[in-house]
């Protein structure tokens, strides 16, 4: 399928690393800081990495957090995994057929100055695998040894993810999967989280919910993004119902390749189009196919880009427990 988008909005794909923001048009604010404003659709449904399903939500989180690996464009425009929060990774094939990956972290820091540790990844991955959280992205870790047992028993310590030291993370897979680094270790769902921060913000949210009024929305630990502690190139500095502003995370420890200030605007497609035409924002996504097709004919700054996407159908039907029925359905498909 094709996703139609503006030339200036190429940076919005969740598979594109933050460095591509330099390819977008940048403006300078009154104080000389480079800034970029982007419309990303509806107001985010969540800032919790294990629940973020919308591309807009994932795009924001991709700028707030940094995973073990990140994606870059390699030869033939293929996405390749390169070190992110990790500075190196080693792979060892074991005699029982399992494969062990050892990640050595680069010594990055969270936005509050605390060191990023291997335990932050252990906590995040165990939280994702926990059946109690009910994340649709949990199967990402199904190739990790102990995942099935953890899912069945609820004992997340069975997941073969451990901190050998504060800067060494060890992950054992059930076998060899060449897409592990590219797909799992760059995913929004496996981004690191600070357990102490999540627990503190959750306690505060629960306390606020005790006095919740009938017409108020229950608070979650992530409800105020400006209080999130992040390890990526940006941290949230301001939020209202129409936009979220990110500013450079000075504790990030790497040279920032994008603008110092990044604003994600929220609204419907019509609002986004008006803001773009008025020069309020630099890029918009998404628009309806009709609007985009019309604009492409009249505006040379538009172009079509192919995007690879995979969709799956999850059946919640007891009749499909019968293997013969599933085989019959499979035979119907003209391959």
Ranges and model annotations:
Residues 73, 177, 185-257, 261:
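Gly/Pro-rich hinge or "lid" segments in bacterial periplasmic/extracellular proteins
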Residues 21-23:
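C-terminal motif of bacterial Sec signal peptides marking the signal peptidase cleavage site
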Residues 242, 248-294:
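Ligand-site clamp/hinge motif
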């Amino acid at each position: 399928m094709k996703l139609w988008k503006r030339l200036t909005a190429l940076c919005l794909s969740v598979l594109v690393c933050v460095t591509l923001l330099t390819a977008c048009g940048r403006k300078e604010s009154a104080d000389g800081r480079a800034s970029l404003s982007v419309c990303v659709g509806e107001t985010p449904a969540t800032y919790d990495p294990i629940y973020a399903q919308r591309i807009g939500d994932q795009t924001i989180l991709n700028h707030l957090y940094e995973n073990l690996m990140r994606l870059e464009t390699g030869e033939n425009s293929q996405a390749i995994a390169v070190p992110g929060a990790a500075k190196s990774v080693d792979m060892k094939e074991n005699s029982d057929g399992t494969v062990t990956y050892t990640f050595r972290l680069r010594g990055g820091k969270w936005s509050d100055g605390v060191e990023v540790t291997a335990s932050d990844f252990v906590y995040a991955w165990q939280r994702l695998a926990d059946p109690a959280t009910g994340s649709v992205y949990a199967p990402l870790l199904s190739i990790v040894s102990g995942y099935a047992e953890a899912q069945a028993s609820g004992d997340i310590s069975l997941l073969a993810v451990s901190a050998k030291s504060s800067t060494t993370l060890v992950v054992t897979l059930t076998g060899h999967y060449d897409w592990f680094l590219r797909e799992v270790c760059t995913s929004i769902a496996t981004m690191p989280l600070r357990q102490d921060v999540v627990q503190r913000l959750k306690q505060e949210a629960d306390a606020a919910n005790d006095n919740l009024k009938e017409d108020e929305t229950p608070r979650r630990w992530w409800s105020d993004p400006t209080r999130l502690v992040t390890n990526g190139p940006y941290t949230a500095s301001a939020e209202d119902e129409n936009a979220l502003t990110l500013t450079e995370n000075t504790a990030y420890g790497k040279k920032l390749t994008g603008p110092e200030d990044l604003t994600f605007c929220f609204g419907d497609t019509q609002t986004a189009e008006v803001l773009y035409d008025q020069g309020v924002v630099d890029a918009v996504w998404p628009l309806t196919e009709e609007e985009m097709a019309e604009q492409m004919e009249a505006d040379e700054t538009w172009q079509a880009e192919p995007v690879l996407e995979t969709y799956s159908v999850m059946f919640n039907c007891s009749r499909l427990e019968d293997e013969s029925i599933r085989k019959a359905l499979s035979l119907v498909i003209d391959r």
